[in-house]
Amino acid sequence: MSVGVPVNPSSSSQLPAAPTTTTRRRVADSQEDHSHVNTVGGGNAVVYVPDEEETATSCCGGGGGGGSLSCCPSGSHHNYLVGFLSLRKFRLVWMLMVENKSKWTAGIARNMRSTTNLGRFILTLLSILVVTFFLIVALSGGVGRRRKHVEKHEFVVSIHPRPTIEKIIREDESSNSFQVLVPKTTSIPEIWNQPEVGNYQKCVARPKNQRPIKQTNGYLLVHANGGLNQMRTGICDMVAIAKIMNATLVLPFLDHSSFWSDPSSFKDIFDWKHFIKVLAEDVNIVEYLPQEFASIKPLEKNPVSWSKSSYYRNSISKLLKKHKVIVFNHTDSRLANNSPPPSIQRLRCRANYEALRYSEDIENLSNVLSSRLRENNEPYLALHLRYEKDMLAFTGCNHSLSNEESIDLEKMRFSIPHWKEKVINGTERRLEGNCPMTPREAAVFLKAMGFPSTTNIYIVAGKIYGQNSMTAFHEEFPNVFFHNTLATEEELSTIKPYQNRLAALDYNLALESDIFAYTYDGNMAKAVQGHRRFEGFRKTINPDRQRFVRLIDRLDAGLISWEDFSSKVKKMHQHRIGAPYLRQPGKAGMSPKLEENFYANPLPGCVCDTSEEQTGLNRFERPSLRAQSLR
């Protein structure tokens, strides 16, 4: 298996090839074409713009002539002659400038009365003449060298006439014509533009008056539950809770019994030494429970979900002081989104975005693969295509699947006791916008949004469910990659058997992508989009699934044209690209579960308006409502 080959069984398309060569040269059509220098063929390319006189007199009247002594040579000879005459003209200007400066210097020298000053001026004059001599020699040899470079394609001299000539010149395609390197992509489509971020920047600095860590009230053991991203955000909450209770946090235990059955430890996935070091001024973190407490039976406790800080400061802290060791068997969503004080909110972000760094082998491979996706300076899209068996079974979504596949999902749903919903109408759920997009729907969505078919797409997901589910996607976008097609077997050898380590790799590639899009609001989508907001509101597309599925159903029924469909899709998503907006607390009586997740949008809390009118605590607690206009 070769590295970096798109996983399209019906296509041999690979990452975009290097720029191709052609013998066609375009003459500018407008003054705008000459407002800047266009380079081709890399950093060594040169563009030269001649005067109108040079363009008009480059041929001697009538025909082009066919002999070797023709007044209007063809192909590359024409360009060499113009280049030589232009450089000669430039050299004559230099000589006139030197002559004028010499006369000026000599006149001053004659007026000098002091022999000492006269000697200094003579020395200066000689220095100027020596430098000028070397410049003339260097310019005299330039044409020959340029011709050699052109023959080697090291750089190209392109002759662009003035905009009064409005035609396309085709170079003689004989063996003597020179080749101009033309980049494959001449402009970046508008779809790759990033959102407007205003004056918002990350702000997670510790308070200047932060008190030093007190003597610990006890030790907190935590068993993080769920998939990687659910465990990740849960661990960040545990750091904040340990701070609230003045507890010493023991390195968390990871879930080994969930659907993924991954035996990886915290040290296998995260850089644990970095984690402890970054948070050293905030919370005491130890690798193991001290020996003197190992024999103590810990108090097991499942904290109440979405609890306020006061719950831990008052109720749980008392239990910690009494028992000295407490175990939390669940860590997901145990701290409220909006009520913790600003210092605790910033601590949650320091833990998530600064302290929790993946292990060295995962980080290194992530860098290699992201560079591989960006070969030839092409951007790439990371698509979280959550069309996996566990998600489809849990949600009851079976649109476009066969009857056998639907039965298979239903069996899985009934076999897992803690999944409460068993009988689900998948059709109704899809129309409500509560199903992940199918691969075909995702492809149509991306095409309607304006992504070209040559887009490099990295699929952030495990195994896509359903026979031939990706066929329609590959037909629209052939340059599709998964971790196992982008990396070699050797590169994946240390992480491939472990689902959480693969999820960490996907997380980094999604975080670093030029655009991230997700087809379902799962834990990874929340974690990645929040991290991208923190890192400068990198473009993140959040499809409006409810409106989109109704629109694509109309398209499939022939009730709407493709042009109208694409226009409507773009319009409905123009404000769903990851621009800043304030996370709003839930209304009275609303379940905290329905609020926007803190880690999906850390504004306010960890992102601040740095404009002049926003200062002091106001920057942290009351971010400018200007962000609402950017939503």
UniProtKB/Swiss-Prot annotation:
Effect of gene knockout: Cell dissociation, spontaneous breakage and ectopic organ fusion. Affected embryo development. Increased arabinosyl and decreased galactosyl residues content in the cell wall.
Membrane topology recorded in Swiss-Prot or TrEMBL: Single-pass type II membrane protein
Comp. bias regions, Low complexity: 1-13
Domain of life: Eukaryota
Entry-linked InterPro entries: FucosylTrfase_pln, GDP-Fuc_O-FucTrfase
Segments on the Lumenal face: 142-631
Enzyme class, broadest EC rank: transferase
Transmembrane segments: 121-141
Residue segments, region Disordered: 1-36
Binding locations of substrate: H384, L385, R386
Main localization (coarse): Golgi
Stretches with biased composition (Basic and acidic residues): 26-36
The keyword Oxidoreductase is assigned to this record: no
Residues of this chain annotated as glycosylated in UniProt: N246, N329, N364, N398, N425
Listed GO MF terms: glycosyltransferase activity
GO-annotated cellular components: Golgi apparatus; Golgi membrane
Cell compartments where the protein resides: Golgi apparatus membrane
Tissues with expression: Ubiquitous. Strong expression in young seedlings, particularly at the junction between hypocotyl and root, in emerging cotyledons, and in parts of the roots. Also detected in the inflorescence (sepals, petals, mature pollen and siliques) and rosette leaves.
EC number annotated for this UniProt entry: 2.4.1.-
Metabolic or biological pathway, per its Swiss-Prot or TrEMBL entry: Glycan metabolism
Similarity field: Belongs to the glycosyltransferase GT106 family.
PANTHER family: OS02G0726500 PROTEIN-RELATED, PROTEIN FRIABLE 1
Purpose of the protein: Glycosyltransferase required for normal cell adhesion and cell wall integrity.
Protein name: Protein FRIABLE 1
Source organism: Arabidopsis thaliana
Higher taxonomy: Eukaryota, Viridiplantae, Streptophyta, Embryophyta, Tracheophyta
